[in-house]
Amino acid sequence: MNEQHGLIFDRLNEFFEELNQQDVAPNQEVIELYIKEIYAEVTSLNADNNPYLSRHSVLERLYNLADLTCDFAEIFEEKLFNHLNALNFRNIELKIAKQYKMNGGNDFWRNIWEIYADIALHYSALNIDSKALSNAKTALKLMIRTEAKPDPKWISFLNSRIAYAYQDIAPDKSINYFNKSSDALIEYNKVKDCYENNMGIILNDINIAIIMLEINQVDDAIKQSLKCLDTLNNLFEKYGENEELVNYISHTYSILSRAYFESKDYDNAEKAIEKGLSFCKRLQENKFNNYCEIIDVLYSTKSLILCEKQRYMKAIELQYKLLDVWSDYKEGFKRSTKICDIYVEISMIFSKYLDEQGMSIESARLAFREIKQYTDNELFMSDKYALSVRRRCYINLADAYFRARMYQSAISSYTNALDIMKEEFDMESEKISLVYSYSYTLYQLAMLDFKYNRKAEGCKRLSYSYRSVCTLKKYGGVYEVLFNMVRNALSTYEKKFDGKIIELDTAQ
């Protein structure tokens, strides 16, 4: 039995050395086999029912296994950019920590709440907000309970993780937790004013600007972005130029440009885009991986402005430039989902503005082809971002079919989108953009039901669409536009069918 335990450690060490020499992760099935092997080993290490190993030996093996598991997690985090496998190994580390304590060990090499914090970080990176939220809250609660004097930096970090998890579920709560995160750093700054704390505070402020923009508080988003730029300029003077500051400045200009666009101030939007791009070029020269995401927002905003000015082919050209930008991105899964997003945007421009439904359908199919390599893999089927990309593909394809009067194909694609949304609702039932898509898709299907004289189905879908969109009306903008569309349809079809579909006075 001792020999068997030793062999497992030898094999794991060999596998780790292999990983260390590679630039891409090996076949997922191989990784899964090692994960199962580690789980089996951890489960077998129980001093109470193990006649071959002393309690000391069990604890020692668990300790060494935890150390090795942590190494695996770090290599997937930092070198292979694979959050899914990093999460798998952090979950094993948590199991080992609990097993260690269960076997009477009190000197585990790090706090359990730190492992929960890492797990929250990876769920957040995988866009699984509900699990990111629960793990971050657990980490914060355990830290406050077990630490005599909790570290303000950890309090700040965990509050920011909770804020990120709330961002697309409860925006007001998200802003509140970002402010709590900053409060902890401001208190710490009174003791020791330092670069890391100031960067943490400005990052929270930038995220608050993003949320304001997402919930259509456009004027507030502009004010918040300008405030962030003032602070960043002061930090620039204080600390000098570095990649992180240049990244935050270009990122803030990308938010400001989109906020100006939403306020229909296209001149200031274009000025912000140019300033953002000038900073972003420095990131691109240094191969800073985040520059792709910032250029994405800047180019996308410029594309929207071009569409407003009816320069549609120029807008499409810019989207194709974005394809080149993302082709250099390191992380394959994110690269493919972003490329898929761009094809969806190209499809929308062809469909909505140019009435080129054939080109729109072809672009949507290219989007499916790009994401197919991942969404056919069961490991990625539950990833929220992948699901949302596939959902948008189907909705956009359905819209193109609808405009081309290919109604049966439109119904099929809208229905496929609804099927994906059922999976998404199981994961994130309150996500704002998901509720919007759900209400819109039901509305479109209701219109098609009425076209084919399916009154009962159409009325049912329209009532569900209305109930959903009522929860979004308070955010204004596109949400209020959809609310009015659905409400007007209800009024029209109630008159046509001479009866109430839903009580109209329930609007929030």
Task: Identify the meaning behind each predicted range.
Residues 41-62, 79, 95-112, 141-155, ...:
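Flexible helix-coil transition and linker loops at the boundaries of alpha-helical arrays
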Residues 9-13, 63, 67-70, 110, ...:
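TPR/TPR-like alpha-solenoid signature
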Residues 456-474:
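TPR/TPR-like (Sel1-like) alpha-helical repeat modules
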Residues 79-80, 126, 168-169, 215, ...:
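Structural motif corresponding to the intra-repeat A-B loop/turn of tetratricopeptide repeats
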Residues 35-38, 83, 90, 97, ...:
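Hydrophobic/aromatic packing residues within the alpha-helices of TPR/SEL1-like helical repeat arrays
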